[in-house]
Amino acid sequence: MTTKRKLIGRLVPCRCFRGEEEIISVLDYSHCSLQQVPKEVFNFERTLEELYLDANQIEELPKQLFNCQALRKLSIPDNDLSSLPTSIASLVNLKELDISKNGVQEFPENIKCCKCLTIIEASVNPISKLPDGFTQLLNLTQLYLNDAFLEFLPANFGRLVKLRILELRENHLKTLPKSMHKLAQLERLDLGNNEFSELPEVLDQIQNLRELWMDNNALQVLPGSIGKLKMLVYLDMSKNRIETVDMDISGCEALEDLLLSSNMLQQLPDSIGLLKKLTTLKVDDNQLTMLPNTIGNLSLLEEFDCSCNELESLPPTIGYLHSLRTLAVDENFLPELPREIGSCKNVTVMSLRSNKLEFLPEEIGQMQRLRVLNLSDNRLKNLPFSFTKLKELAALWLSDNQSKALIPLQTEAHPETKQRVLTNYMFPQQPRGDEDFQSDSDSFNPTLWEEQRQQRMTVAFEFEDKKEDDESAGKVKALSCQAPWDRGQRGITLQPARLSGDCCTPWARCDQQIQDMPVPQSDPQLAWGCISGLQQERSMCAPLPVAAQSTTLPSLSGRQVEINLKRYPTPYPEDLKNMVKSVQNLVGKPSHGVRVENANPTANTEQTVKEKFEHKWPVAPKEITVEDSFVHPANEMRIGELHPSLAETPLYPPKLVLLGKDKKESTDESEVDKTHCLNNSVSSGTYSDYSPSQASSASSNTRVKVGSLQPTTKDAVHNSLWGNRIAPPFPQPLDAKPLLTQREAVPPGNLPQRPDRLPMSDAFPDNWTDGSHYDNTGFVSEEATGENANNNPLLSSKARSVPAHGRRPLIRQERIVGVPLELEQSTHRHTPETEVPPSNPWQNWTRTPSPFEDRTAFPSKLETTPTTSPLPERKDHMKEPTETPGPFSPGVPWEYHDPTPNRSLGNVFSQIHCRPDSSKGVIAISKSTERLSPLMKDIKSNKFKKSQSIDEIDVGTYKVYNIPLENYASGSDHLGSHERPDKFLGPEHGMSSMSRSQSVPMLDDEMLMYGSSKGPPQQKASMTKKVYQFDQSFNPQGAVEVKAEKRIPPPFAHNSEYVQQPGKNIAKDLVSPRAYRGYPPMEQMFSFSQPSVNEDAMVNAQFASQGPRAGFLRRADSLASSTEMAMFRRVSEPHELPPGDRYGRAAYRGGLEGQSSVSMTDPQFLKRNGRYEDEHPSYQEVKAQAGSFPAKNLTQRRPLSARSYSTESYGASQTRPVSARPTMAALLEKIPSDYNLGNYGDKTSDNSDIKTRPTPVKGEESCGKMPADWRQQLLRHIEARRLDRTPSQQSNILDNGQEDVSPSGQWNPYPLGRRDVPPDTITKKAGSHIQTLMGSQSLQHRSREQQPYEGNINKVTIQQFQSPLPIQIPSSQATRGPQPGRCLIQTKGQRSMDGYPEQFCVRIEKNPGLGFSISGGISGQGNPFKPSDKGIFVTRVQPDGPASNLLQPGDKILQANGHSFVHMEHEKAVLLLKSFQNTVDLVIQRELTV
């Protein structure tokens, strides 16, 4: 039986036995690599119902196939069909047709014969239109035509009344036919990725619609008509441009999922609380500043995402969201969580990354189901003890680079409240700046790439900076949310963060600092405060550029200054620069005795001093007379003295009050950004993608605890302030918040005026330490402290909309104009605690970078108050530094008039009446204002008058008076009162008038930083420095020994940093076409205050710190368009240091540099030049150089590649391909700003010296002298240079913008290589100057030539701040002196290196680490200073670490404890250095300038 069955089983299938044909209805030939339809198919044409030919290579369908009359489903997707044969009409029973992923261009008209068709899938075909016959397929229920080329639908499309699903994603539809209202059964409609600019009117008539996708269109409004869709369950409107949601959306009663991500929403309607069935609400990536309380009515809400907004608080009603399971509030500005959050007991995942949380409520312990909690990138000091109740917690993220999801927590008592708290080694958190360097240009940005590469390659040896130091320095803790006045009380603890922990991640530190700085981004007054923070108590007005607005800012001294702020909706480069300059020409307090009258009055700021804020851009500034002659030897601070105090102050800076540092301001700032970054300080971030991030870092750096500087070391305080700017060694630079500190000086009265934005520089005079931020991209922070701050990830933090806001960057540049707060803050700094600095200018600036990028990416980018003001241009507020007691007598008012749009004029010159004594005012002339004018330089190097610059700055003859400012530095002593108010502004106004794109690190800044970076030398109570004085020709007249007298630390110290940063900013602006939309006026770019020599050193440090900012600048460069800029987080990026800040710093720095630079080593500047590659000097180096050559620093720092410089097209992004280096015009623009005309010779305080060359002051003149094709030449030169970076060339590259730009040797501190060449307009200003500038630049060029050596020298000099190195630097300066004759263009072409390598033996005692980072080596990232050299190079030196006085960035390590490092692999070198015991003997090669 069994056998029989088996036999039958086998036979039955056989047809012979069955006696009938088998019925085959389904054939599947999918994925058979068929090139044609198999013939076997035709054997079953009677029975075949389904045929699958998916994923073959069939090119055509045979006619025989259409004889299969019974075919109901034909599936031939993913083949090579080019058409559907008309014979398809014979398939009358066909119900489903799938021809997706072919090359079918159209449906045949007779498709209408397939009456039974219900489903057509024809996606991913080049179908451009549907035939009329298509609408006769009346049984069609599902139609999929995604990713086709449809531009319209047939007018009678509504005949398909049975249609239930219609997917038309990724077409080119702009409208829908009105007949579609007949589609009564339509439930799902997908119109995503089309070109709708408004919601089609017919939609609200499709009453049964349940799912609607309208994402990725161009909708600007979500109309109330959507509320008619009562059945709507799912609505996706993400990735549009929606600015408002109508209240009537509440009509969608059935709505469960509402997606509004990535729009431009600034608020949600209260009626959203009526969507009772809502389970998912996504409003991430918008511009929300608050959430409606009615959100608590969404009782069924399970997922809520409001990340990447500008929220400063969550509504307490969030506690009613009892069904909530996922809560994401990343990348906002939350300082705290509502206690009611504990009522959300069902939350399993909560992410609070990148906020400003300083503590968490105990009630979080009630969220028993919490499994994942992300708290990374906040400012938490500990966790509440109630965390022990979270039994289900599986992941607690406290850091982005945390190795394990859960890490053990220890219990300890809170130091203040004595409550039990949980902590571990990751606390307290440091604000971190994102290292986001986005490019807003389509072209490759070699400079940015190089910087990023260097960062990736950098190995940082632990600089054992205690966390506390980092905290103090990096964080401006209480400042964040405080009102400016509150801040004044609390004092900004802008302690420079030490490089210790952060040395490895200077950017991170900077970012942290910035984040820590709670300064409201939008508080322009804060920025003012920073400026006021400068020693001067004088009330400084934000740049008048915002003349349209009139604001009265109370000065620290209590005087009110009425500033008319012009709003320039879309400032053009020159205009912006001039605006910035105007800002810089703020009215100083009469108490300072400095009165700046700008020949071009923009507005009259009614100040007690009645300083005029003349804002006419074109008008040449009136000759400035220093009534007080600034020369008060007694008050003057010797460089040495300044330096020591500098070192001290960074550690214990006086409390800084950030004026107007109200978080609210941040919103304003976004507004400002929207208004085109009124405060140019933002420009860095905004200007370029790079810029934003760097700006951020700069921002954090700027928050130096100037306020906390010890009163005992008043001089030291100022010095430290300067140092913060200038000296990497001081944590201050990291704090870089000095700007804030400066703000602090600003009286609370100033704070309220948000509209007044102080230029970035104003906001960041102190912050210019942050210069390192700019530089940091390319280099390991040379000066750990300043650099770290500068290195803040802020730089990298992405400026979301940066690309869109190209204009903003420009504005930022402008914003730079400002008074360095440091000046005000100097010695009196601690005293002015009561003064409230304006809200963090950086916060505003932070926003600036780009509405999109910055917002999320630059938490630490504080858009400084300058930006915070709603004013569209940063220059509208010159910083009105509150008159904070400082080395400058509070009475000294800084008027910075930056009227000329070109900035070329000495318009910036205001008459500054300095008190004879410590209150001497430093004239910070916006570098951009005297783009090419040497006056500033003269001021800086009180001794010599730069004929070049001065020629150009022929603005009603600037009289440069050497004005010794005790408050400044000894070099500052001869702050000649240049006729250029901006120069005078320099320190006080932060010299921020020079608004350099922040993204571009300024070599100057770097140098500045370097100078101050040497913490120990600065710390010295007093020092003797040899200051080389230069005559007008910039020929060294001799070395003057300057003793650091005990002076109030010149505000310039911080300012220096600011100056430094401004320089960088400018560079960045130049670098990134967008950011550099228009080059800020040269003067602005180069505006520096003129600190004493010591201050100069500080300035150097500051610049050095700015070095890292180069990345920022670049970033802004690459990306922001002015619109985006505006969109950028208005105030959301408080952390981000606005480029203006950086600029301001540079400007400040200029003054400082001029004065301190005597002692500063020119090489450092040079080194700074080499910073980008070889060009980028180490931060410290740069600082030192900056000290010596303030002007240069600013410009040099700017990497051309970061932004292609489009001097002509303000808004247009230049093709970066030419090179990241700025066009000559860009460089030229920078040049004047960079120049701090303060004599280098500390002693030379002759007014006559300062007076030198008043005639050439007009920058426009210098522009005129530039060859017509100078930009092209510059770009070519830059590009060539970029492409072939030999070691010498690399330094040249660094010089790129800096190398030949500096007008004279003294300018070397601001090497203005090609990349620093300002635009033609600037050249005009610098007119004949340009060539003199060129001479100057040639100094820069020389610095570039000397870069390798100079960097070393500068480092040494800065480290020691002792005469030996300074002497060398002066000699190099002397060398430069002769070079002044060089043309900018000429210098551009030149690659010659004046430097020579020299070997040194250095012994470092580990404590606990070596305190420096290395790069290069075989298989290493390469040497940032000399990419062609495969040796091991020092890229960052912890400012206060064991190597701070011994090594400089750029040093090549030849041996270590007998081990040769010549041909060593990178990893081996790192391991070897780490393996050494306590003492390490190094043989290093440093390039010294001849």
UniProtKB/Swiss-Prot annotation:
Stored InterPro entries: Leu-rich_rpt, Leu-rich_rpt_typical-subtyp, LRR_dom_sf, LRR_R13L4/SHOC2-like, PDZ, PDZ_sf, Synaptic_Scaffolding_LAP-MAGUK
GO cellular component terms listed in the entry, alphabetical order: actin cytoskeleton; adherens junction; axon initial segment; basolateral plasma membrane; cytosol; dendritic spine; filopodium; glutamatergic synapse
Modifications the protein undergoes after translation, according to the UniProt entry: O-glycosylated and phosphorylated.
Residues with Phosphothreonine modification: 831, 865
Tissue: Brain-specific. Highly concentrated at synapses.
Translocase as UniProt keyword: no
Residues with Omega-N-methylarginine modification: 1149
Glycoprotein listed as a keyword: yes
Alphabetical GO biological process terms: cell-cell adhesion; establishment or maintenance of epithelial cell apical/basal polarity; neurotransmitter receptor transport, endosome to postsynaptic membrane; positive regulation of neuron projection development; receptor clustering; response to toluene
Classification via Pfam families: LRR_14, LRR_8, PDZ
Region (Disordered): 663-709, 775-808, 822-899, 1194-1218, 1238-1265, 1282-1312
LRR repeat copies, ranges: 23-44, 47-68, 70-91, 93-114, 116-137, 139-161, 162-183, 185-206, 208-229, 231-253, 254-275, 277-298, 300-321, 323-344, 346-367, 369-391, 392-413
PDZ domain mapped to chain residues: 1398-1488
Family per record: Belongs to the LAP (LRR and PDZ) protein family.
Subunit structure: Interacts with CNKSR2 and DLG4. Interacts with CTNND2/Catenin delta-2. Forms a complex with N-cadherin through CTNND2. Interacts with CAMK2A.
Name assigned to this protein: Leucine-rich repeat-containing protein 7
Organism the protein comes from: Rattus norvegicus
Lineage, highest ranks first: Eukaryota, Metazoa, Chordata, Craniata, Vertebrata
Gene: Lrrc7
